[in-house]
């Protein structure tokens, strides 16, 4: 963690930790805070949360999100916490906590998967993503002095460990669901549904290794700098629900394909990149095939899975996204970028500010 972020995080004395990512991360954060002389209490909202906090002192919340501010008020009278921590600021319970904390002058810090990936975790006071307090004024960044590149500790992510934590979280959460009858998860909370999706994701990945083995060489050679890359996000991404005008990823696909068919150069192609975490949940091939026919695009639209994002960006002419962090990667690759939702990096001078029709 960089020094200034660490200073902000540790400037409190008494911490209340709400829901973290699936796994022991927030339990570990609480223990780390205590090792540095702070007080830290975890709040659990379902059986999965409780399982990963089982070795700690925790408080359980059994009521609805609307009743959460009152619960926080009563708790604050007993445990005078000055800082609330959570993972993601768009979950219903976290939204209520954020509003309440702001009204009481209590610090609200949200963790998020890193804006820069891999190797980074994001934590910001007040909110993350489009709620970030990072300035949108380009002059602010132009006036910043050159800084040395930060030291980055190389961490190797473990897919199996992540799957294991998710499996236990869902199974135990489902098993004890009757103890938390008012809890509503921000995503599907059925371990059986998620297990089916994971199995489907696995065999689809193996299938795509065969069916799409010739796609990347074609993009790198024949279509180099001749295609626009449209990045998809997971179907239930809170960034779409809260920070865009789209109700569904399919609406975004439709708008991009329609605009491309009307205004893009006839010799150009559109590559639509499926999100790898959505592989087992959604498949947009029938929609893309239908829209290609409806908009007269023929074979100019290429739908891809699991191809390496750096290579796709390197050989793309330009990039379109709703508000994915892949947009930051596009900027790093010095690609023209159109943001269709609200994003912290959608800044004049960095991204295209005009209409999508003119972007092509």
Predicted features and spans:
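Conserved catalytic-core segment of nucleotide-activated headgroup transferases in glycan assembly
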Residues: 36, 181-286
